Amino acid sequence: MAVPARKTSKQKKRSRRGHIKLATPAMHYDATTGEYRLSHRVSPKGFYKGRQVANENKQQNND
């Protein structure tokens, strides 16, 4: 079984993991509500692509 000959230094470890990071979420301006929101999601007011697709005061029951 292979065993490392030397301890991996902090610099070597961190440079190897340099590409592992979180991506910035894709946000865009919603003209109907005047706020920024995630792309391809319904706004809290119930709008998607400028159309009302859901009522904001309607709650779903997950029973």
UniProtKB/Swiss-Prot annotation:
The keyword Oxidoreductase does not apply. Residues 7-20 have a biased composition (Basic residues). The keyword Ribonucleoprotein applies. One of its GO terms (cellular component) is large ribosomal subunit. GO terms for biological process: translation. Residues 1-23, 42-63 are annotated as: Disordered. Pfam families: Ribosomal_L32p. This is Large ribosomal subunit protein bL32. It comes from Lactobacillus gasseri (strain ATCC 33323 / DSM 20243 / BCRC 14619 / CIP 102991 / JCM 1131 / KCTC 3163 / NCIMB 11718 / NCTC 13722 / AM63). The gene is rpmF.
